[in-house]
Amino acid sequence: MLALAFALFRVSRARCFSLVGEAICHVDTDQPLVALTLDDGPTADGTPWALSTLRRYRVHATFFLIGASAAGQEKLVQQILADGNEVGNHSFTHVRMVGHSAGFYDSEIMRTDAALRQAGVQDLHLFRPPYGKKLIGLPRALARHDYRLIMWDVEDSSGAATPQAYAAEVVRQARPGSIILMHVMYRGDRIAQAALPLVLQGLKARGFPIVTVGELLRYRRSVPPH
């Protein structure tokens, strides 16, 4: 039992594997493209700052938004869209999506879907699980609601103490088809916030155009059979 529990724990946090359906952590492409994803929010401080930074570098990103945060922050969601960015579903309450009932998963997905559509989002088909956690119930719910499970293959996992170190780690890991995860929405994300311009500069210096997840998927070389 202990071995089984450990195996399930590892699967639940695996970035590029899902017991049900497909977990997209990287896109097989012959184009030198990377996708930038920004998780959480929207927040009154972090979102305008992130949008300003993206505009400065003429870059679009995919914002995975929390439903409870988006409700009441419709203008921020609309500004994300107006700037040409993409919006994805990041659950309603930002809890770990493991060990719940089918109804719970459906509610988390569809309450967020409703909040985002109320703010003007029309094309909703990308879902990122909070903390990257998933087993069987969540992927099944995503399939029921025609969502794709989007993970990532690049993040700062080194606990960088400076924006320069953070950016260097992210830029070093990037390769064609990478999906980059950053958290820049909250006060506790100061290092990542300061690193964002450095990441954009570093990726550009390496010759990587930065796109949304949806754009990256359009350059996918092959789609695995379902």
Where are these regions (language model features)?
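Short histidine/acidic/glycine/proline-rich micro-motifs that form metal-
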Residues: L65-A70, T93-R96, K133, E155-S158, ...
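Active-site beta->alpha N-cap acidic-glycine motif
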Residues: R10-H100, F104, E108-Q118, P209, ...
